[in-house]
Amino acid sequence: MSAPVLVVDDLSVRFAGAPAAVVEGLSFTVQPGRTLALVGESGCGKSVTSMALMGLLPATAEVRAHQASFMGEDLLGMPEARRRDLRGDRLAMVFQEPMTSLNPAFTVGEQLMETVLRHRGGSQSAARQRALEMLEKVRVPAATQRLAAYPHELSGGMRQRVMIAMALANDPALIIADEPTTALDVTIQAQILELIASLQAETGSAMILITHDLGVVAEVADEMAVMYAGRVVESGPVAQLFDDPQHPYTLGLMGSMPSLGPRTGRLATIAGRVPTPVEMPAGCRFASRCPFVLDACRVAPPPLVELAPGQQVACLRAPLEQHLETPA
């Protein structure tokens, strides 16, 4: 097997003055050509994780890890100049809000060319040709004319295609896609997902996909890590977790998904709400909402244990099949 593109071991993020870490004990590996989805509801720490890896958090953030290795280099320990060299080159990001991610004062072509010139060098004409190639690759119609367009002259879907072109312009080893379809309508979402998947297959890039949408996960991801209140509660191959979720939170997420077929009742909901940093419990952070909770769950965080090859779950009641008929 090829060496992993990214190895993260025990990543934690805490902001100055905060009573608890917003990300705690996060560990995962991303292999070449594979897609890992970080899944969870708003505020679970998905985007903070991505910004920590990119080095884009404010100075008030304290980021620690036993290991955060990108292609053999220490992401957290490297000089800022080296990190700037990696960002936009071997390590790229597609942000979730295409309407505000591009600079309104510069044309699309100027912004694409800047990315190429910053990391590849070469002439203006070569950079312009590369920018044109990338717009054509992401299927922007009338690509030559679009080079001279300003962001406000493009639709949201077109802007997101430009963001994808910019991320892929220098053939990155890893793409971090933070909710890349959130601001788009359903039809455009499907087109963007298909585009990302085809370009990833073409380039062999690895990807971290950040999303709350399990439908998106099923469409494009190979592995998934389910996050709740800053911690991973379950991880494993996508097909395995969809077929046999073993954490009560994962089970609740699956139960809340709408289906195309006939429904006999209401969609499932998860009672309660995510604890704020002030309310973080000593034990399992899902305990206050869990129908299977034990007294021991409130004492200490349950460790991630392997239930099946590749599938890990942080739950004292796993496997849940033993308790589905008799919740506590």
Task: Specify the residue positions occupied by each region the protein language model found.
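P-loop NTP-binding/switch modules centered on Walker-like glycine-rich loops
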Residues: 41, 55, 171-172, 176-180, ...
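Short catalytic/signature loops enriched in Gly
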Residues: 4, 141-145, 235-328
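Conserved ABC ATPase "signature" region
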Residues: 73-74, 125-145, 254-255
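Conserved ABC transporter NBD signature motif
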Residues: 62-74
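ABC ATPase NBD coupling module
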Residues: 75-92, 110, 118, 124, ...
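Conserved ABC ATPase signature
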Residues: 149-154, 158
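Conserved structural motif at the start of ABC-family nucleotide-binding domains
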Residues: 6-8, 23, 86
